[in-house]
């Protein structure tokens, strides 16, 4: 079947005197069946000023008006339309069903696989994951666990472990925080991750603090994301995992 025809045209006649800022794009706010936690970072982000911007939106030849922003920013009325020429998009912990393969740590307690780097703690000859990070030529994402995620194969029967995690990009502009939970049930390891504290921006400008206070979707959409996984330990040399995200 053919998809819908979408036409978008934006003409901005004046861009001077803007004070861009960082924003975690709320792309996940409307997803009903997420396949990951979308950590999409917009650097040097700006809103489009109504006075100097013409926007045309057509879907199946039907024109739509762009949403406007409820409060003025930089003494101007703005469209909710936002853009950035510097983005860093990470789909974290995508849904997965299949076998898990072992990774061999180096002597400095790190391991890399498919562009993802793991920092480990070694306790009683068992490795624990304390940090995961990845980067492109310009930006970097960090996922930290406190306490570190233990060696799941060696967990005692019936044990339940709780911890916290935080996600930051470039260690500066804000963070996503939440909890993780691990439980061993017979021959299965059950894991749960929820970003229940949402996104906390790190902005000092008062107008941005007001913006994030009144437009709550920017901070709160991650709170609705829940990840569950089950890892089968029937054969410790041939681990199998099924994991998925859902909105709650």
Spell out what each predicted region is.
Residues 1-248:
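Structured soluble/peripheral alpha/beta segments that form catalytic or ligand/cofactor-binding pockets
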């Amino acid at each position: 079947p053919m998809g819908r025809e979408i036409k978008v045209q934006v003409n901005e006649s004046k861009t001077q005197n803007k004070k861009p800022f960082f924003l975690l794009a709320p792309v996940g706010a409307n997803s009903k069946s997420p396949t990951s936690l979308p950590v999409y970072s917009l650097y040097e982000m700006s809103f489009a000023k109504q006075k100097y911007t013409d926007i045309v939106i057509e879907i199946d030849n039907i024109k739509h008006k762009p949403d406007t922003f409820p409060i003025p920013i930089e003494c101007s009325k703005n469209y909710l339309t936002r853009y950035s020429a510097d983005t860093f998009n990470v789909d974290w912990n995508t849904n997965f069903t299949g076998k898990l393969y072992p990774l061999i740590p180096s002597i400095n307690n790190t391991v890399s696989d498919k562009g993802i780097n793991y920092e480990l703690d070694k306790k009683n000859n068992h490795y624990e994951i304390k940090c995961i990070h990845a980067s492109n030529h310009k930006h970097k994402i960090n996922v930290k666990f406190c306490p570190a995620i233990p060696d799941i194969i060696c967990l005692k029967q019936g044990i339940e472990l709780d911890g916290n995690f935080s996600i930051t990009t470039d260690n500066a502009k804000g963070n996503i925080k939440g909890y993780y939970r691990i439980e061993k049930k017979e021959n299965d390891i059950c894991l749960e991750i929820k970003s229940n504290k949402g996104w906390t921006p790190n902005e000092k400008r008062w107008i941005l603090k007001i913006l994030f206070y009144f437009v709550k979707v920017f901070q709160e959409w991650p709170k609705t994301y829940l990840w569950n996984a089950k890892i089968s330990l029937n054969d410790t040399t041939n681990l199998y995992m099924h994991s998925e995200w859902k909105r709650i």
